[in-house]
A protein has these predicted regions:
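Bacterial carbohydrate/catabolite-sensing allosteric modules
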Residues: 2-191
């Protein structure tokens, strides 16, 4: 005894139960949609923390491109800290300065996408005419933008309920508690 019951959300640790979005499936669906819209030059600014979330999304990005027979230059894959608009702005500038610019940029979260939009618009480029963008989170703010942001909406209510249920179960029946992983599906919001 004496250990504190823990359930993590969107972070996998070997000794704790975890509840997370289906990052692999959702990123695959997002890329399938972007590719179906005619894009082949797709950049991805990913989180810098190398958590399981970052690794899963990055692997799914590469896997989806491979499944579609698309090769992208290594410089299309950039790092920026999650929710860090200044980092994202620098990486967006870098991508826009490339001689062979991407036609679509995927951001690690919707807040980052908003930072990217500001950089793109400051250059006089129109979205989606000059360049397309996509986010990941499905925040309310991202759906108030014009044009609305293509993104993956994470079912945060379901993730929270699932985590709470697992935590209550661990507290009530510690002797039968197992380290489990639960995955909650996200929803592609096409715009």
């Amino acid at each position: 005894g004496g250990s504190i019951p823990v359930v993590t959300i969107d972070y996998v640790h070997y000794s704790c139960s975890a509840v997370s979005s289906n990052n692999v499936k959702c990123m695959g669906e997002l890329l399938d949609y972007i590719i179906s819209m005619g894009h082949k030059k797709i950049a991805y600014i990913h989180g810098q923390d190398f958590s399981s979330v970052t690794r899963d999304r990055l692997a799914a990005y590469y896997r989806a491109l491979e499944n579609h027979g698309i090769d992208i230059p290594e410089e299309y894959v950039r790092e920026a800290r999650y929710l860090e608009t200044e980092d994202v702005a620098k990486q967006t500038e870098y991508l826009l300065d490339l001689p062979d610019k991407p036609t679509c940029i995927i951001y690690p979260d919707d807040t980052a996408a908003i930072g990217g939009i500001n950089v793109i618009r400051s250059r006089g480029l129109r979205i989606p005419e000059a360049i397309s963008i996509a986010g990941y989170d499905g925040t309310r703010v991202s759906q108030m933008l014009s044009p609305k942001l293509t993104t993956i909406r994470q079912d945060t209510d379901k993730i929270g309920r699932e985590a709470a249920d697992r935590l209550i179960s661990i507290i009530k029946k510690p002797k039968t508690a197992l380290v489990e992983r639960a995955v909650v599906e996200g929803i592609l919001l096409e715009r």
